Regions:
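Arg/Lys-rich, low-complexity, intrinsically disordered basic segments
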Residues: 1-98
Length: 98
């Protein structure tokens, strides 16, 4: 992934750009309880991941489900999550612990 930027006046919260030209919009614009990068609540993180593990069945890391799980619900900051996501891309390692 080359870049992830916050959307302005859009239906989704972020936009991810990939080196192959793929652009994916993802994340609710105004989630009621926020995401892990907003609140760092480990119990909410665990519950989110359990509910959304099925999103990984596509094996397509450019899909919104992958991006939400690995960028918004993985590490405490978007920057840390992006670094982790890029490491996972490099090693094709998309196993997640919760």
């Amino acid at each position: 992934m080359l870049e992830c930027v916050e959307e302005i006046n859009e239906s989704k919260r972020f936009r991810a750009y990939f080196s192959d030209g793929t652009i994916t919009k993802f994340g609710q614009t105004n989630p009621k309880k926020g995401t892990f990068i907003d609140h760092q609540n480990k119990e909410l993180k665990k519950n989110y991941i359990k509910r959304h593990l099925k999103d990984l069945e596509t094996n397509d890391y450019t899909r919104a489900g992958y991006l939400s799980l690995f960028l918004l619900w993985n590490k405490p900051t978007l920057k840390d999550s992006m670094n982790d996501f890029n490491r996972r891309l490099k090693y094709n390692d998309f196993n997640i612990k919760y």
